[in-house]
Curated annotation (Swiss-Prot):
Record keyword Hydrolase present: yes
Protein name as it appears in the record: dTTP/UTP pyrophosphatase
Keywords, in A-Z order: Cytoplasm, Hydrolase, Nucleotide metabolism
Domain of life from the UniProt record: Bacteria
UniProt keyword Coiled coil, yes or no: no
Cofactor(s) in the UniProt record: a divalent metal cation
GO terms, molecular function: dTTP diphosphatase activity; UTP diphosphatase activity
UniProt catalytic activity: dTTP + H2O = dTMP + diphosphate + H(+); UTP + H2O = UMP + diphosphate + H(+)
Organism whose genome encodes this protein: Bordetella parapertussis (strain 12822 / ATCC BAA-587 / NCTC 13253)
Similarity annotation: Belongs to the Maf family. YhdE subfamily.
Amino acid sequence: MSDATLAADPPRLYLASASPRRRELLLQIGLTHTVLRVPAPPGEDEPQHPGEAACDYVRRTARDKAERGQAWLHSQQLPDLPLLAADTTVIVDGIVLGKPADRADALRMLAALSGREHEVHTAVALCHQGRLREDVSITRVRMRALEQAELQRYCDSGEPYGKAGAYGIQGLAGAFVSHIAGSYTGVMGLPLYETAALLRSAGIAVP
């Protein structure tokens, strides 16, 4: 199916995310969609609760995004289509790494990942016909040891910003990754296997 055909097809679901990577991944499997730009509440990047496991944290944040999107959808009286939300976080030494606040924060995160293995958790939540379905992808990623000069150049590229763990595996940082066990698309931000399975379980055909 060509991009032109996809563009002509009516949207089949809402994507409650501004991430261009998630949009590209949905189009990759032929799922036309509308990006739902839900107004973000104060403190959107909610911290992990005390004692909350990383997997539970990322599930909760994806679920919250989906439920908030569904409420906004109804408040705007928009057509009722399935709504998909996702959240990604990086975990090293049991510590959740979200999106870096600034260059110093990005350098700190990248230094923590250098030469080590970490986990990337991406949770997906689907609201459809009054029911919420969810799943989570957990992928182990190993980065080679990185020189300080490499980290500085990477930050100069602007790529670390807006990404959990301060890197994007589909970009320049792909050259940093020596091994991956799990879902490549999950590390990008939307695990396609789990996403397609959720959609099928809700009776939504996936090409």
